[in-house]
Amino acid sequence: MFEIAKGISNSLAKKSVGAKVDGKNVDMSYILDHDAEVEFIDIDSPEGEDIVRHSTAHLMAQAVLRLYPDTKVTIGPVIENGFYYDFDPVEQFTEEDLEKIEAEMKRIVKENIKLEKYVLPRDEAIEYFRDVDKNKYKVEVVEGIPQGEQVSFYKQGDFTDLCRGTHVPSTGYLKAFKLRTVAGAYWRGNSKNKMLQRIYGYSFSNEERLKHHLKLMEEAEKRDHRKLGKELELFFLSEYGPGFPFFLPKGMIVRNVLIDLWRREHEKAGYQQLETPIMLNKELWEISGHWFNYRENMYTSEIDELEFAIKPMNCPGGVLAFKHQLHSYKDLPARLAELGRVHRHEFSGALHGLMRVRSFTQDDSHIFMTPDQVQDEIIGVVNLIDKFYSKLFGFEYEIELSTKPEKAIGSQEIWDMAEAALAGALDKLGRKYKINPGDGAFYGPKLDFKIKDAIGRMWQCGTIQLDFNLPERFDVTYIGEDGEKHRPVMLHRVIYGSIERFIGILIEHYAGAFPMWLAPVQVKVLTLNDECIPYAKEIMNKLEELGIRAELDDRNETIGYKIREANGKYKIPMQLIIGKNEVENKEVNIRRFGSKDQFSKLLDEFYTYVVDEATIKFDK
């Protein structure tokens, strides 16, 4: 392929790290011996960067073996913006070891070692890893490959690894990488297996992209919700409850504002609210399928010699609530909303602040409808999601449509109807979307909504999921116009996703400086001296009467110190400076977060202004 690319242009040959031959990825060393459609993969393209990242994982493994030859290498996939590789070392790696490994990687890059692919029969591959390489992990991987299949390897100098490819032509292509951290990881993610060491790294096609990403990561570190959550007194985490965050009074204000807003907007949109039990009998989870497919993530308990499970999802309870009463087609659509607390067991190593927890509140809604109502209901949900994401928070977002997977329940006809309804709703609204072929759940297609935060990261939050499974399992019906029983179409949807996770995203998006309507403390009243305190307290009383969340700082500290604390530490949206002039003129001196400018308003004018500033506005 290299010679073909070179025949077109030298620059194409230099920039290509692979090619597609009739849609199949191949290395640049591939010899084309038949007529085919060929497309070269540019190193700077998303697919090209994935090839670079894959090859950088191999580069790191080679460097590790040069430095620590008794280490066993296991697997090393590509992840977003980089890669990782799991190792079984004789002694645990430290952060200092990462510097040595990275330096060795750079030496190997300078050697510009060629990557060569070859294949062995499955049994010979097992023999190689068992007898020559003496690597039980690779033996296990190869044993999972069907009998009779060929197993592909890549060799780069003194290093050989099991791999399907595709890879860069030589190590000289790998010039922009940075090792990030080392962490524990169980072999194949199973806690019954040995704990390995996972080294994470970033990798890009060029140094400029790497530097840009590292700058973003530096900014992300400043915005870390765990750090800001502690500084802003929003929440804390305790060793007595890993994965179970404690919300403090200020954090509860943020949480309750989001929840109250959610409830009001759903009531306006025609939703009825539910509350279903947090713990339900094992039999229910057997009917829903969770007991067989999700058992290891569920918390259980025995009551009166019966086995119960704390709910990991709200859906079965929502189905029971709908099924509890007889429904006519005239009652549909039935929009049932629930802010339900769910519990899911996550491995301790996967827990991350509010982003990955064991207990969280999901803003679920389940809509039961007739087939001819599906598209209109989807349009209604998309508009509601847009109202929150775009008009309230000002988020840009992307939509992905995931279609029927190979293994699925339901007829092709109902899948076609459901996918057409999802796509048709988006087309009708003029929304762009990406299709993920075969990535839907086995029980129905879905739309995923991914919001973009202030530093360009994408977060999957909202989902619209059609479900053919639960109505069938629970035998859910309604009485149609013909007087007969019919199966309703069920739709699951979330907007926030998890309240806790969404708060974590907002903390990082706003870097802790919430918009005024959401801030735990909206106004801080700062006095210059003791003579101003009575006037400041009058203002505080009026703000409380107006429903404004305000605090008074009448400590015997300098005004500069008070401003730095209110502005820099607590990120209060509005600060009022009260001195002699303000008392005499019946006015306030206003300073907004992040600004050094100050301006004055008479009291009556200020009260109108502050109420308007603190009002929730869907107008972004």
Curated annotation (Swiss-Prot):
GO terms for molecular function: ATP binding; metal ion binding; threonine-tRNA ligase activity; tRNA binding. It comes from the Bacteria. Gene3D superfamilies: 3.10.20.30, 3.30.54.20, Anticodon-binding domain (3.40.50.800), Bira Bifunctional Protein, Domain 2 (3.30.930.10), Threonyl-trna Synthetase, Chain A, domain 2 (3.30.980.10). PROSITE patterns: AA_TRNA_LIGASE_II (PS50862), TGS (PS51880). GO terms for cellular component: cytoplasm. Its cofactor is Zn(2+). Its main location: cytoplasm. Residues 224-515 are annotated as: Catalytic. Its EC number is 6.1.1.3. It is found in: Cytoplasm. Keywords: Aminoacyl-tRNA synthetase, ATP-binding, Cytoplasm, Ligase, Metal-binding, Nucleotide-binding, Protein biosynthesis, RNA-binding, tRNA-binding, Zinc. SUPFAM superfamilies: Class II aaRS ABD-related, Class II aaRS and biotin synthetases, TGS-like, ThrRS/AlaRS common domain. Residues 1-42 form the TGS domain. Binds 1 zinc ion per subunit. It holds the Pfam family tRNA-synt_2b. Zn(2+) binds at residues 315, 366, 492. It catalyses: tRNA(Thr) + L-threonine + ATP = L-threonyl-tRNA(Thr) + AMP + diphosphate + H(+). GO terms for biological process: threonyl-tRNA aminoacylation. Catalyzes the attachment of threonine to tRNA(Thr) in a two-step reaction: L-threonine is first activated by ATP to form Thr-AMP and then transferred to the acceptor end of tRNA(Thr). Also edits incorrectly charged L-seryl-tRNA(Thr). HAMAP family: Thr_tRNA_synth. Homodimer. Belongs to the class-II aminoacyl-tRNA synthetase family. This is Threonine--tRNA ligase. It comes from Fusobacterium nucleatum subsp. nucleatum (strain ATCC 25586 / DSM 15643 / BCRC 10681 / CIP 101130 / JCM 8532 / KCTC 2640 / LMG 13131 / VPI 4355). The lineage of its organism: Bacteria, Fusobacteriati, Fusobacteriota, Fusobacteriia, Fusobacteriales. The gene is thrS.
